[in-house]
Amino acid sequence: SDLIIVPDENKARQWVEASHFFGEKVQYIPAKDPLFYTADVHGNAIARDRMLAIKKIVDDKCGTFVMTIDAVMDQVVPLSDIKNHKMTFKMGETLEEATIAEEFVARGYEKAPFVEAPGEFAVRGGIIDIFPYTQESPYRIELWGDEIDSIRSFDKESQRSIEEVDALTIYPASEIILNQPRIEHGLRNMEEDYEKLSQKFKKEKKYDQEARLRKEMDRVREELRELHMLIGVEGYLPYFYENTECILDYFPEESMIYMDEPKHIRERADAFYLEFSESMKSRLEGGYLLPKQANTVTDYESILYQIEKHKMLCYSILSAEINDFRVARTLFMDTKSIQSYNNSFEQLVKDLTKYQSKD
């Protein structure tokens, strides 16, 4: 697998659209929004797109991915943790219906009366419905006693079966796995930081900040202990995992990294990191978050170190603008910008004829 790094989302979309012309689709891996983890109305769509890409990487399917530098700077869980929490169900195997809901919830799935959207599951009387993030349709697992009797995809509207399969692999609906040991581990780390920061606010007579922090911590405790989930869990990543990774760790060293306009990437990375750091500092001082929540983004110098472990190709309109890397070879290409034809087929034909006559 190869990775294209771009300065912004518009550039990423251009790569995806252009890839259709060449027959091989470039897959977009969106950034998590570290400044607004709890306010992202597109959260499920982002989580699903990211998990689809991660599945492709885990399955070792060759492909090309594109990411903004913001997305590359997001800290992520070790890839091994996602691999270890895939679930595979096979015909004839046994399944504990009593505990399956707990397993799904730990992997980020939401219990519902009926499955209607990706990320939901339902359990009732020997029937388990689940809509994996990595599938186009929900699946129904029917039990005979505690043995899997059938596995089939179905239409969520009509409930009619689409296809029967012998096995089904389900990827998590969240990159952070919240099983009971990890919940306890995360809470211990949070309580430790909470006590220190709470005492600091009290000592400095910052009672509003202390009350705000206490309210947030109460919410976190309640959601984790009662619901076994946490809204905005990505913002608490360092509390649940001692060692986080950069998404570049997901790509083998033989992967090629393409940098589209390195100067613009550097400018965006520096601006993003500054914006993130200032926002986190302000929120920390205001009692809106815990200290380690400010450590969910990797600085650009560390990203460069990771990039240099791979083979690399940089594209820049001005060659003098590549300063972050030692250039081993330079290739110059003559290109021309073209006008927008606005559905004027006649003008397109004229221009093509003119270009052909010059050859």
Features from the language model and the residues they span:
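ASCE RecA-like P-loop NTPase motor cores
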Residues: 1-359
